[in-house]
């Protein structure tokens, strides 16, 4: 819960999710920006970088409201931060490095069935993704077919973020 979320956890999450992306980009982006062909950076965000998590999805029966589990605040902050960071990068190396963000939705990879059913009701396609449904977008973003895309945010979430 937000009111009980330890500051140490916040810093740990931000360190991995945002500082890690910053450091990777700082060194990799600097190197590929020197190449005549440049390169591509794809930051992986989430549909929860575009929309707020519906905390009701995490509710469990028999628990008091102040004890209910929630999606940690740091997750959405990191994922939306990656979108902003990508937009910044698109203007920083615009002629050498293409920087885009992929925002996948949830993946049905063994989550509890009742949770999957609750989430699926929030998605126009009424299901979570299969693990192989993101690879086409990644291949496209890495290819010359997307050479004019820079600073874009691509959502692959079955329509969840349109609500």
Residues covered by each model-derived region:
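A conserved structural motif in NAD(P)-dependent oxidoreductases
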Residues: 123-134, 145
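Short C-terminal tail/terminal secondary-structure segment
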Residues: 56, 60-63, 139, 150-163
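A hydrophobic alpha-helix adjacent to the NAD(P)-binding/active-site core of NAD(P)-dependent oxidoreductases
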Residues: 2-5, 13-14, 119
């Amino acid at each position: 819960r937000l009111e009980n979320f330890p500051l140490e956890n916040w810093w740990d999450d931000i360190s991995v999710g945002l500082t890690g992306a910053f450091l990777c980009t700082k060194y990799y982006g600097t190197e590929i920006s020197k190449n005549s062909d440049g390169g591509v950076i794809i930051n992986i965000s989430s549909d929860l970088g575009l929309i707020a998590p519906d905390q009701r999805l995490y509710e469990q029966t028999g628990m008091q409201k102040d004890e209910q589990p929630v999606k940690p605040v740091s997750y959405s902050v990191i994922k939306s931060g990656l979108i902003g960071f990508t937009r910044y990068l698109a203007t920083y190396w615009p002629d050498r490095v293409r920087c885009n963000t992929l925002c996948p939705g949830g993946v049905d990879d063994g989550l509890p069935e009742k949770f999957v059913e609750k989430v699926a009701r929030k998605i126009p396609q009424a299901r979570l993704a299969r693990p192989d449904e993101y690879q086409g977008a990644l291949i496209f973003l890495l290819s010359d077919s997307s050479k004019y895309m820079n600073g874009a945010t691509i959502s692959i979430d079955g329509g969840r973020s349109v609500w």
